[in-house]
């Protein structure tokens, strides 16, 4: 009998984070529960006591010639490399898929912020004569998805979302919709962010380092979603089925429980819950999760605007076959998302 998890499935995963490059370092961090954050050097902020989740194990030269790597910003490097890893995880070989039916949707917080800083610094100090045209393409938030699509020949739908702490979830929400409509057979989806000293100084001046004292991070967390019939035709290994999804906007003060009810009421019980963004700070949400094993990646690898990508990868790595999982994401001003997954191949559950 068909279920809600039979239409869209997950066939590939990829992770780059402070835990390391690839799925195994993230799996190890989830298993031992030890934070991979490191101390921010004193010269960055002028004081000690702060931590960040830098992806220090990532070396672009491990994946491409140095001259080629120079044309990308750091966020695009994460996206290009992680997309290749995700496609390989899904068993999708280069040239072995229909480019027009394969797309990419990413959440991204700041894009190539280091490139933007350099581009604007030259402009402000030297005027228009100081502008470096080669830098500009990597200053926009959609550069990572665009560069990944060019490198991997993904000619299907290509959209980037910048929506505070729910950027990756917004991408996931739309990617599922695209697949359901039949506009693509497969989608690479998730989140990517870079982190540099200028950002940290900006966060400090805005009071964000005290508000989110756990530490900010960088990296990429990507999933490959496919229409189930397409995945089965090519004999893909199915990691999980994608079930229902819901979203609500801003939780009105005094009516938070009503909003949470719209998000969660009537849904089957979950055996694992992952939290992203500021979901752990929403008291009515946390109350509803009492007694359910809970997973958060922010304390392990750091927080970013597209942290939901890594949280989703961690969720699916932790979800056993046949188990029901719930992923929740929130931003202080909304939106709020709830996604349902079922571990393993739904047809075999």
PLM regions and their residue ranges:
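Short, well-ordered, mixed-charge alpha-helical segments that flank or form enzyme active sites
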Residues: 112-115, 169-171, 195-199, 251-252
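Conserved beta-ketoacyl condensing-enzyme motif
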Residues: 9-10, 27, 31-147, 151-152, ...
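Structural signature of cysteine-dependent C-C bond-forming condensing enzymes
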Residues: 2-5, 89-107, 118-133, 154-157, ...
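Cysteine-centered functional microenvironments
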Residues: 14, 62-71, 131, 155-171, ...
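Glycine-rich anion/phosphate-binding loop at the beta-strand->alpha-helix junction
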Residues: 185-186, 191-196, 200-205
